Amino acid sequence: MSFLKNNVEGFGSTVVNTGEVSGQGLSGAYAQTIRDGYPLFTFVMPTFLRFDAFGNGVYANGAKDELQGSALPKFNAGLTNNFSYKKFTASFFFNAVTGFVVYNNTANALLLKGSLKNAKNVTRDVVNSIENSINPGNVSTRFLEKGDYIRFANASINYAVDVKQGSFIKGLNISLSGQNLGLFTKYSGLDPEVNVDKSRNGVPSRGFDYTATPRARVFTLGINARF
């Protein structure tokens, strides 16, 4: 279990912006900043409020940029256990990460509900959206989401097979293991544990999801024989 609290210090009045945002009409747009007195990799963007009666976006404070949350988690914990029963042994590991946000650039660039309403086989939330089809997908908290998650990271089970005394095989174990077995999160993208490189002018970024490939779920069957 670990906690993280950090602030950039000694930066003076210097402000470094990073986190290039991809998408139509978003050339040169950014969503992250590094500045004195704030956590590293803090997001900066207007606060989205709602759509108006015409389906256009409404933003707080005249759509001025505001400092939002950080991409660095504040809390990280793990739970592991090993146990055995007769000839079975097993283990599992869960990890939980909270206190950070992710910018869903995939939704910003490709999943604007207003522009998808005239397509075929769309989801219910697209059909029911009041967003105007020409409403621009500006960088805003509309696409900034909590990334908190609990992951069933791995598990394994092993069985020691009985072998006859004096047989050719002295010992035999059969095992089955799995990686990335489950993910519990309210993040709307595929996986909140992403970090697509959206650096700007050589300054690194963190916490951006842009068409990222989710972690694979892997199962492994093993047989260990001793002769």
Which residues does each PLM region occupy?
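Hydrophobic, lipid-facing positions within transmembrane beta-strands of outer-membrane proteins
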Residues: 75-81, 152-157, 217-221
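Conserved small-residue
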Residues: 1-71, 179-189
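Outer-membrane beta-barrel pore domains and translocons
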Residues: 1-2, 84, 95-97, 177-181, ...
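Membrane-embedded beta-strand positions of outer-membrane beta-barrel proteins
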Residues: 92, 174-176, 223
